[in-house]
Design a protein with these regions (language model features):
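Alpha/beta enzyme core
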Residues: 1-201
Length: 201
């Protein structure tokens, strides 16, 4: 979001995202990151076919051991609002990202996208946001023998923190929500609470 003048996740021309040209740049970025020492590449753009192109480029450049974490299930969600506000892209974005991010009312599409990304070379997959999509995390875990990660995004964090600050709930809700990800089948969780949780465990 913060690295473009328009707030979208790819190259924009005539109000349309150029899928293939965006993938070319993502592939170049992946090689640069691998050369810098990254063990895992995690493209979150949601362009069609990018996992296959990145995997081929990594292998061609002798980075076959670099893994790919695909944001295979990334929904066009209102839960990203606080992040966009924090990085200054909230007012940049014209329109929405529904043409390339997933429809939150669609369940089956998630499984199709995960299957495609695994076929293209993904080593693990992300479901983002996390809490509103516990059913999707469970579906992915049941249907694929691959690590699945949950992303507790900025909107989830803000809702929880604001509720704690106003005395509506106690901070045990943090552990409850994170446990729900594990119960649904997540192998790992990305959360803004990670540092505080690590200190208290």
């Amino acid at each position: 979001d913060p690295y473009t003048s328009h707030g979208h996740d790819g190259i924009l021309k005539s109000n349309k995202i150029l899928n293939d040209k965006t993938i070319d740049i993502l592939t170049q970025q992946s090689i640069i990151q691998a050369k810098a020492g990254c063990d895992v590449i995690a493209p979150s753009d949601m362009m069609d076919g990018r996992i296959g192109k990145i995997r081929k480029a990594l292998d061609k450049n002798n980075f076959s051991n670099v893994r790919i974490l695909s944001y295979a299930v990334k929904y066009a969600s209102s839960f990203y609002g606080p992040f966009r506000d924090a990085v200054g892209s909230k007012n940049l974005l014209k329109g929405d990202k529904k043409t390339y991010q997933m429809d939150f009312s669609n369940r089956d599409e998630a499984l199709r996208e995960v299957a495609l990304d695994i076929k293209e070379g993904a080593d693990m997959v992300m479901v983002k946001p996390g809490l509103p999509y516990l059913d999707i995390i469970r579906d992915v875990k049941r249907n694929f023998k691959i690590p699945v990660l949950a992303y507790q995004v900025s909107g989830e964090y803000s809702l929880i923190m604001n509720s704690i600050k106003k005395g509506l709930v106690d901070d045990k809700i943090i552990y409850e929500t994170l446990t729900s990800f594990k119960r649904a089948g997540a192998n790992a969780i990305i959360s803004y609470f990670s540092t505080s949780i690590a200190k208290n465990l």
